[in-house]
Design a protein with these regions (language model features):
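Acidic, surface-exposed loops and disordered segments
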Residues: 1-330
């Protein structure tokens, strides 16, 4: 490391703050599939393929969406500290966030980064009012990204729900899918605290049981009938589905979708709206294609599906300490 390339203590403190906010981004099974490199004028977000989900996400599409969410959090946190962040995605999938000092930058919904959570609870059935939907639709959308909202009580909503249930039938009938899911389950408080990642028992509202008991219960709960009973109740309690699409099925667009998704989630959080993923149809190419045809959005790639509504806050998933995520400094 050359002396003139070292990061000053004050800048490094700002960068560490940005990273703390970046890694609050959502990720599939809470794998947190990222590492970071710090340089005097930029931060790189790198995909960590050791935390990939080869069964449910074989093309790493959801992984790169998560990296895009992290990049958006980083840019918002940078603005909060008086830095302008400019994002670009390299062909190897590394996200480059160029940082420069700039006064008077808005940091939209910065306070919501810490409040945002994936809420898997049953919602209260209330509908989102039109003026709130208009606010959600007004967020900046990256080029090539589509956002489609479908209200409960419409045929489109019911069609999407049916594809979620069919997705459950396929995934829960796949032993490899269930094995991968169990790999990322964290069965009690001790287990979740040891790893600070994965799907904690707490986010599902489960009790803190001895691990052998929790593993037995989970092993006998992973079946399509049980999952569909849960999802029918949860979907019936929601107000809307939100479907996020890309026009090109490639990494740069997946990252752009993640940035747009994170803006939407933070705006939703600010409005008191809960969200949870219902991405089963998008994780099965045949179902995703059928959904695009059914909804009349052929030419777009359905990528992320969430349900929206109102609910009490849930438990927060843990995040790994950032010290272990920084792999290099310029």
């Amino acid at each position: 490391m050359n002396a003139d390339s070292r990061i000053s203590p004050s800048i490094r403190a700002d960068y560490l703050f940005m990273i703390e906010q970046a890694v609050r981004a959502p990720s599939g099974h809470n794998t947190q599939p990222w590492t970071l490199r710090l340089f005097p004028d930029h931060i790189d977000i790198l995909p960590d393929f050791s935390r990939a989900l080869p069964v449910v996400d074989p093309d790493h599409r959801e992984l790169f969406v998560s990296l895009g969410c992290a990049a958006e959090n980083l840019c918002i946190a940078a603005a909060h500290k008086g830095w302008l962040g400019k994002v670009s995605t390299a062909i190897d999938g590394i996200i480059h966030v160029e940082l420069s000092r700039q006064d008077g930058i808005e940091a939209p919904h910065f306070e919501q980064i810490a409040r945002r959570q994936t809420n898997r609870r049953c919602y209260n059935g209330s509908m989102i009012p039109d003026n709130t939907l208009a606010l959600l639709k007004s967020i900046p959308i990256e080029p090539g990204i589509g956002i489609h909202l479908y209200q409960k009580g419409t045929q489109a909503f019911d069609d999407i729900a049916a594809l979620v249930y069919e997705g459950n039938e396929r995934q829960m009938g796949d032993p490899a899918f269930k094995a991968e899911l169990r790999q990322w389950m964290r069965y009690n408080r001790k287990h979740q605290d040891e790893t600070a990642d994965g799907l904690s028992y707490a986010v599902f509202g489960a009790p803190n049981l001895p691990r052998f008991m929790a593993e037995f219960i989970i092993a006998h709960s992973l079946d399509a009938a049980r999952q569909n009973r849960t999802d029918r109740r949860n979907i019936a309690s929601a107000s809307h589905f939100a479907l996020f699409t890309t026009h090109d099925n490639r990494r740069e667009q997946w990252v752009a979708l993640g940035r747009t998704l994170q803006r939407f989630l933070l705006a939703s959080t600010a409005a008191g709206i809960a969200h949870a993923y219902a991405n089963q149809p998008n994780e099965t190419p045949e179902l995703a294609e059928r959904m695009a045809q059914t909804l009349g959005i052929t030419g777009e790639y359905p990528t992320i599906l969430i349900r929206l509504g109102y609910a009490k806050a849930s438990a927060y998933a843990l995040r790994r300490p950032i010290e272990g995520l920084i792999v290099d400094e310029g």
